[in-house]
């Protein structure tokens, strides 16, 4: 089955896979939790700022494609969502824990080297070494419908990067990452500046409070003398 998903659909499914593995007690996810996962600043490339409405629309599209299902617990009025991706339900698409972890990281962070994947996917599945990651990537490339491709090595780089192949052809991986990555870097810069400004403001407040305490102590000492 040839999968052609948009970047937003890939992000939603990647988040559902990640949270199922790393926080099973909180899975399936509510719309709010899913939106937070999509916009998470750590382990994401690019960083996104999706509204609940956009995430809901994306989820609805995935439900129509039978890749996500809505789940409501007994007595609960809040719908929760779980993926049906890479499971036994899809037969040939069922993956091992290591394959699933690698695919999830590629979906959440885009093209990566085996070394990067080992460090980042370790939270979801155990890899004995980088060679283990490379074998997993080869298995994903050698399937009847390849799920991963090896990208041309960049000049001066020792390791080649690998990318998933489940994106819509209308959204080339490299082009999307290059465009979105710039926005991500800008956003990251704004976030860091904002954090520094908040820290400075907090320090200024603390200094002002200390100055008041010192003045109070001086006044008290003066009165005693």
What do these predicted ranges mean?
Residues 77-116, 160-191, 195:
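Short, amphipathic alpha-helical interaction segments positioned at domain boundaries
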Residues 56-74, 137-154:
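A short, conserved structural fragment
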Residues 120-123, 152-166, 208-225:
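Helical coiled-coil/dimerization "stalks"
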Residues 23-47, 111-127:
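Short acidic, hydrophobic short linear motifs in intrinsically disordered regions
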Residues 183-224:
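Amphipathic alpha-helical oligomerization/assembly segments
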Residues 1-14, 21-25, 59-94:
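Intrinsically disordered, low-complexity serine/threonine- and proline-rich regulatory segments
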Residues 88, 95-137, 144-148, 153-155:
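Extended, charged alpha-helical interaction scaffolds
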Residues 6-28, 93-111, 137, 142:
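Positively charged, polyanion-binding regions of nucleic-acid-associated proteins
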């Amino acid at each position: 089955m040839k999968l052609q998903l948009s970047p937003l659909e890939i992000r939603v499914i990647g988040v559902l896979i990640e949270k199922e593995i790393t926080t099973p007690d909180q899975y399936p996810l509510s719309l709010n939790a899913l939106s937070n996962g999509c916009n998470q600043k750590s382990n994401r490339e690019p960083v996104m700022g999706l509204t609940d409405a956009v995430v809901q629309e994306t989820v609805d599209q995935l439900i129509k494609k039978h890749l996500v299902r809505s789940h409501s617990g007994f007595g609960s009025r809040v719908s929760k969502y779980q993926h049906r991706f890479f499971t036994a339900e899809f037969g040939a698409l069922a993956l091992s824990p290591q394959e699933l972890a690698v695919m999830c990281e590629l979906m959440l962070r885009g093209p990566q080297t085996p070394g990067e994947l080992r460090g980042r996917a370790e939270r979801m599945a155990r890899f004995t070494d980088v060679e283990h990651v490379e074998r997993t990537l080869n298995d994903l490339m050698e399937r009847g419908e390849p799920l991963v491709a090896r990208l041309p090595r960049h000049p001066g780089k020792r390791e080649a990067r690998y990318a998933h192949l489940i994106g819509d052809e209308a959204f080339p991986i490299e082009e999307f990452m290059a465009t979105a990555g710039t926005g991500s870097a800008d956003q990251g810069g704004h976030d860091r500046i904002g954090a520094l400004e908040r820290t400075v403001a907090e320090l200024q407040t603390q200094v002002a409070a200390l100055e008041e305490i010192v003045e109070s102590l001086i006044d008290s000492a003066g009165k005693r003398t």
